[in-house]
Amino acid sequence: MSLPRRFIFSALACAVLFAASVLSAKASSFTIDTNPPNASISTFGNPNTATYGQVITAVAGTTTLDSFSFKIQTTGSITYRAYVMAWNGTQAVGPILFESANQVATGIGFQQYTYNTVGVGLSPGTQYVLFASISNTYLPGNSAGTMAARSDNPYAGGSFVYMNNGPSFSLLTSTPWSSFSGYDLAITANFSDNVPGALVAPVPEPATMLLLSTGLAGVVAKVKRRKRNSHRT
């Protein structure tokens, strides 16, 4: 009866591996959230300020940036892109770590715009700038935007920064940016310990675990029936 025994061991091994994958799928997470806003900063767009950003500091253990968001309102529409770059204390440092497709902000009243990065790996303790810019979408009338902010410095790991760089994106990495003392943008930035750019296996529901245990019980019962039948013959 060596074959059934090996079959049982294989089933148990699969169960152990499955349990291990379930545990590993429970990723750690961390969020920077400076909401709700108590102030606003304007004016974002052409021919006004082309780039608004927020400096953040990556935290050890959760260094994959999965998504971030800004709150924008406008009386017209603004076409822009969202970016992530390293920060050296005064300006952005290449290469570009994340660049969104063209985004369009519309409507009076602050709307939250979220950018999913598919996982950007950051270095713990290092500063980065999350920013929105119209420099690569510098269209006439692409203006009248206001960004939600906080005026009470709620986030110690960075601050609000901006640049009047017009259509010249290269100035962002060659010229010091400006800032408002004590201000942060109203942002939400979500981090995890997932592998950058990788899909994380979903954590199974209790029903899935029940099916697994039921299946293993069925395997054991089937082997026992085979043993009884072999004794009868």
Language model features: what each stretch is:
Residues 95-107:
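Solvent-exposed serine/threonine-rich low-complexity stretches and specific carbohydrate-binding patches
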Residues 220-233:
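C-terminal membrane-anchoring or membrane-association module
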